[in-house]
From Swiss-Prot:
This is Ornithine carbamoyltransferase. The keyword Transcription does not apply. Pfam families: OTCace, OTCace_N. InterPro entries: Asp/Orn_carbamoyltranf_P-bd, Asp/Orn_carbamoylTrfase, Asp/Orn_carbamoylTrfase_sf, Asp_carbamoyltransf_Asp/Orn-bd, Orn/put_carbamltrans, OTCase_ArgI. It is an enzyme of class 2 (transferase). Keywords: Amino-acid biosynthesis, Arginine biosynthesis, Cytoplasm, Transferase. PROSITE patterns: CARBAMOYLTRANSFERASE. Reversibly catalyzes the transfer of the carbamoyl group from carbamoyl phosphate (CP) to the N(epsilon) atom of ornithine (ORN) to produce L-citrulline. It is found in: Cytoplasm. It comes from Pseudothermotoga lettingae (strain ATCC BAA-301 / DSM 14385 / NBRC 107922 / TMO). The keyword Transcription does not apply.
């Protein structure tokens, strides 16, 4: 069956089928091959992308901006200081105005409700570049990187070490459930995943032959892991909780000893970045031969370009 994503938003991967995600990953691989071969297109010529940032960004901004501009489009950066979003003008009205002026909107900020409202009222594709609860474009890059290394996603065991409630843990759970992977959240009891999301993903897992577990013992969790993934201990906006998180998460640091506990020589390490080396991951691991974080970072651009090609053309 032909896949047509024209006009679609990406708010979470819950709204995408496994077949649609596979389509995006295949298109991402094609985009990457074209990029490496210096094949130039102008697929976004005459189109404009509004990029709204409440939170700072390196990879997300660079990926969206360069991907759109390379294809002949006009990306516009809008910080929260530049526009009236939710201040003197409602989010609904901002969405209506932008929808009359641009072809797509990217939002990176705090509340998931904001990106959902933009999608509801703008009438154009809206992309979630990160909220407090989800980071779907990052997971597309994670899945692409994993597939590049292992040649498949089905049955691959991915272990997330750290804060089981954060946006990466949530989004990876969805992505792994959709793609038939074995997903383990390894976190202390205080930072376990949201129960409602767990139940949603467990329901998906029954249909895709996925497996989802929550384990608090790091050594038990990583046994047989193909991918070990971690994120900063205190996410953006949670800096005041840094000391508490260090106390809770120090036993969940990804180091060389833990990497060896997988029992596999080809286990890879992933991190959405930025990383605090020496906290959630040691220097030796992130800079070591098992690390694929720089491929993963590059793949942000290819997956985001593929997403925009699929939804805008």
């Amino acid at each position: 069956m032909a896949i047509n994503l024209t006009g679609r938003s990406l708010l979470t991967l819950l709204e995408y089928t496994p077949e649609e995600i596979s389509f995006l990953l295949d298109l991402s691989a094609q985009v990457k091959r074209e990029s490496r071969a210096r094949i130039v297109h102008k697929r976004f010529a005459g189109k404009t992308l509004a990029m709204i940032f409440e939170k700072r960004s390196t990879r997300t901004r660079m990926a969206f901006e360069t991907a759109f501009a390379e294809e002949g489009g006009h990306p516009i950066f809008l910080s929260i200081q530049d526009i009236q979003l939710g201040a003197k003008e409602s989010i609904e009205d901002t969405a209506r105005v932008l929808g009359r002026m641009v072809d797509a909107i990217m939002f990176r900020g705090y509340k998931q409700e904001t990106v959902e409202t933009l999608a509801k009222y703008s009438g154009v594709p809206v992309y979630n570049g990160l909220t407090d609860v989800y980071h779907p474009t990052q997971v597309l890059a994670d899945l692409m990187t994993t597939q590049e290394v292992f040649g498949k996603l089905k049955g691959i065991k991915l272990v997330f070490m750290g804060d089981g409630r954060n946006n990466m843990a949530n989004s990876l759970m969805i992505g792994c459930a959709k793609m038939g992977m074995h997903y383990v959240v390894c976190s202390p009891a205080e930072l376990r995943p949201d129960e409602n999301l767990m139940q949603t993903c467990l329901t998906i897992a029954k249909e895709t032959d996925s497996k989802i577990e929550v384990i608090d013992d790091p050594e038990k969790a990583v046994d047989g892991a193909d991918v070990i993934y971690t994120d900063v201990w205190a996410s953006m906006g949670e800096e005041s909780k840094q000391q508490e998180r260090e106390r809770l998460l120090r036993p969940y640091q990804v180091n060389e000893v833990l990497m060896r506990k997988t029992g596999k020589k080809d286990t890879i390490f992933l991190h959405c970045l930025p990383a605090v080396k020496g906290q959630e991951v040691t220097f030796d691991v992130i800079e070591g031969k098992q690390s694929r974080v720089w491929d993963e970072a590059e793949n942000r651009k290819h997956t985001i370009k593929a997403l925009m090609i699929a939804t805008l053309l």
